[in-house]
């Protein structure tokens, strides 16, 4: 199973569903590339997005899992599991 699928399964298992999106929140601080990831979301077309804020200017960012390396995804998974 790929790390992307492990993350998606984790969201489906533990996520909070609002009727459109399913979201999960980290169990510990998760910082990747100077941005703190605040939640992972499965969007309306079944893609996983990471919602984060920049540590310097606090601007919000959305990124898809493909925007991260496998090493970063393993770290993200560890923060959210």
Descriptions of predicted regions:
Residues 17-76:
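Acidic, low-complexity, intrinsically disordered interaction modules
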């Amino acid at each position: 199973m790929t790390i992307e699928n492990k993350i998606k399964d984790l969201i489906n298992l533990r996520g909070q569903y609002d009727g459109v999106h399913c979201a999960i929140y980290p169990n510990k601080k998760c910082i990747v590339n100077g941005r703190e990831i605040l939640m992972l979301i499965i969007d309306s077309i079944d893609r996983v997005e990471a919602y984060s804020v920049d540590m310097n200017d606090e601007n919000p960012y959305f990124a898809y899992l493909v925007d991260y390396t496998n090493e970063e995804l393993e770290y993200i998974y560890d923060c959210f599991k």
